[in-house]
């Protein structure tokens, strides 16, 4: 897989951030974009946390950006949008090609209750990559159960932080996504369901 021209950090959980510590082995220079709004839980922004943690890596250049305001990255238009991943601030992402109009939306790590303003930015993607950590049936094993139930009582959020498979598919419908792939899937999917469509698998590529 070719190395990226830039990076975007959506939140500061280790599985979305700590790999930057190896950037010096791979890059001469890596611009990293992240939100500039202060998180009440940490008293600093995502961009601020990235800059503080990796201030010793001159090859990482942090570029703060304001949520819900489009910015240019690698010739594309990107917009960070607030989502629901308590207790920390977290962001989804919409990326559009200004020449073709092709659009990719990423839910980011989130519960089903994505704010309306963020949904408006994410809406109508050609491809939607949606957080779908487990099937809704596994919510009974979470200490907090499930949340954001659909009219049939199916939980669309696992605990408080991630969407269930069913929640991710409902959000895709809400956004009128042309194609949806489910990502951030845990290893707790039953073997009989682990490779069912539309769960993404390593190595997939997409043309928009």
Describe the predicted segments one by one.
Residues 114-207:
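Cap/insert and terminal regions of metallo-dependent hydrolase folds
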Residues 1-107, 111-120, 178, 191-208:
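Binuclear metal-dependent hydrolase catalytic cores
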């Amino acid at each position: 897989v070719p190395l990226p021209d830039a990076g975007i950090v959506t939140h500061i959980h280790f599985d979305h951030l700590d790999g930057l510590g190896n950037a010096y082995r791979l890059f001469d220079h890596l611009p990293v974009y992240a939100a500039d709004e202060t998180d009440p839980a940490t008293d600093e922004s995502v961009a601020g946390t990235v800059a503080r943690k990796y201030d010793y890596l001159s090859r990482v250049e942090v570029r703060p950006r304001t949520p819900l305001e489009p910015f240019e990255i690698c010739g594309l238009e990107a917009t960070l949008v607030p989502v629901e991943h308590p207790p920390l601030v977290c962001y989804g992402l919409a990326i559009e090609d200004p020449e073709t109009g092709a659009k990719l939306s990423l839910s980011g790590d989130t519960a089903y209750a994505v704010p309306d303003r963020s949904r408006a930015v994410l809406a109508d993607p050609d491809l939607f990559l949606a957080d779908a950590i487990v099937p809704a049936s596994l919510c009974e094993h979470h200490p907090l159960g499930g949340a954001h139930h659909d009219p049939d009582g199916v939980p669309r959020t696992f605990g408080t932080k991630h969407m269930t498979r069913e929640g991710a598919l409902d959000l895709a419908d809400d956004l009128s996504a042309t194609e949806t792939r489910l990502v951030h899937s845990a290893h707790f999917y039953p073997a009989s369901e682990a490779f069912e469509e539309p769960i993404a698998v390593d190595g997939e590529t997409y043309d928009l």
